[in-house]
Amino acid sequence: MKRVLLTTGGTGGHIFPALAVAEEIRRQYPAADILFVGGSYGPEARIVPAHGIRFEGLPVRGVMGRGLKAPLALAAMTAGVARGMRLVGRFNPDVVIGFGGYAAFAAMVAAKLREKPCAVHEQNSVPGMANRLLAKIADRVFISFPDPQEYFLQRKTVLTGNPVRAAIAAAGAHRAGHVPACRLLVMGGSQGAHALNLAVVNMLPQLRDAGVEILHQTGAADLETVRSAYDKAGVQATVVDFVEDMAAAYAWTDLALCRAGATTVFELAAAGVPAVFVPFPFATHDHQTANAAFLADRGAAQSIAQRDLESMPPAVLAGQIIDLLKDHGRLQGMSAAMRRMARPEAAAAIVSGAKDLIRKKPLRSLVPEREGE
């Protein structure tokens, strides 16, 4: 494996699994040349180079939900495919792996037109529109959750789990003997979540009186408002727009109050962190609700619909959070259930599957089967 092109972007939920695979490729093939192709306007343009990986941006934007701007986005996507064709021809990758999102679309189509081996990885239990389309042209489809609905052709689909970075897995090892200390991690994904921010701000007096320590990722839009609310409530906490070191955050906390994007779900599982999920209700095909249900049904988490969160008296939500934080036995049981859902071998499985694709080997199981799958 000499040259690998990875492509995705738009949100951390797509970007970080791709970075985990890049990390594994570097571990197995230190001399491999990795090129990451994403959107010029997405967070990948900042995040990927910061991880020491060469990045090429295509001037593409999402087409779905853009209304009158959709024709312009479609024109940009077409131009992105043309530019992607030149880029793929120049780089000449052994294999191309896409991780979903509109930013992967142009590069994947370009790679297929160049007749390069192509694979896609789907992070969520319900696939997004980009991967539903790209799976039709891909040679392999790697999935994070079992696929009882058969969204993808079974003859080219293999379960791998969702890859997490080595530092996140190491946080899980660090937490093996973790003694709960009434610590809460609040995060709404890489861009924050206004509904979560508001809910936590409204219950700050109860959390303060219960002695709860808080690390709160607000997203950029709400940072100053939330910081001001903590100051007014007299709550000492770490309030940031973005947590740079998620591994340290997972190692520190006892419980997460968060969205249920697939990357968050699998990182929590790898780290063994129990969660109260508030799925983003407007996610494509409501995939976050399905992700949360998968963990809640197995005793690793609780799930609250956003409409219920918004109508719930602050004291009720605070009571639910505080009761969990004070119940060490229950937290430890949820943590153990989280660990059972982890897929620490996911990145290696995807690299192995990509290697099979290059060598034109038939589809095979890449991870051990588990009870209930």
Swiss-Prot record:
Q: Which domain of life is it from?
A: Bacteria
Pathway stated in the Swiss-Prot or TrEMBL entry: Cell wall biogenesis; peptidoglycan biosynthesis
Q: What are its E.C. numbers?
A: 2.4.1.227
Which of this chain's residues are annotated to bind UDP-N-acetyl-alpha-D-glucosamine? T11, G12, G13, N124, R165, S190, Q288
Localization annotation = Cell inner membrane
SUPFAM superfamilies associated with the record: UDP-Glycosyltransferase/glycogen phosphorylase
Keywords assigned: Cell cycle, Cell division, Cell inner membrane, Cell membrane, Cell shape, Cell wall biogenesis/degradation, Glycosyltransferase, Membrane, Peptidoglycan synthesis, Transferase
Q: Which top-level enzyme class is recorded in the Swiss-Prot or TrEMBL entry?
A: transferase
Could you state a single Gene Ontology molecular function term?
A: UDP-N-acetyl-D-glucosamine:N-acetylmuramoyl-L-alanyl-D-glutamyl-meso-2,6-diaminopimelyl-D-alanyl-D-alanine-diphosphoundecaprenol 4-beta-N-acetylglucosaminlytransferase activity
Q: Which reaction(s) does the protein catalyse, per the Swiss-Prot or TrEMBL entry? A: di-trans,octa-cis-undecaprenyl diphospho-N-acetyl-alpha-D-muramoyl-L-alanyl-D-glutamyl-meso-2,6-diaminopimeloyl-D-alanyl-D-alanine + UDP-N-acetyl-alpha-D-glucosamine = di-trans,octa-cis-undecaprenyl diphospho-[N-acetyl-alpha-D-glucosaminyl-(1->4)]-N-acetyl-alpha-D-muramoyl-L-alanyl-D-glutamyl-meso-2,6-diaminopimeloyl-D-alanyl-D-alanine + UDP + H(+)
A single Gene Ontology CC annotation of this entry is: plasma membrane
Gene3D superfamilies in the record: Glycogen Phosphorylase B
Q: Does the keyword Plastid apply?
A: no
An example GO BP is: peptidoglycan biosynthetic process
Membrane topology qualifier: Peripheral membrane protein
Which purpose does this protein serve, as stated in its record?
Cell wall formation. Catalyzes the transfer of a GlcNAc subunit on undecaprenyl-pyrophosphoryl-MurNAc-pentapeptide (lipid intermediate I) to form undecaprenyl-pyrophosphoryl-MurNAc-(pentapeptide)GlcNAc (lipid intermediate II).
Q: What does the similarity note say?
A: Belongs to the glycosyltransferase 28 family. MurG subfamily.
HAMAP family on file: MurG (MF_00033)
Q: What is this protein called?
A: UDP-N-acetylglucosamine--N-acetylmuramyl-(pentapeptide) pyrophosphoryl-undecaprenol N-acetylglucosamine transferase
Give the organism, scientific name: Oleidesulfovibrio alaskensis (strain ATCC BAA-1058 / DSM 17464 / G20)
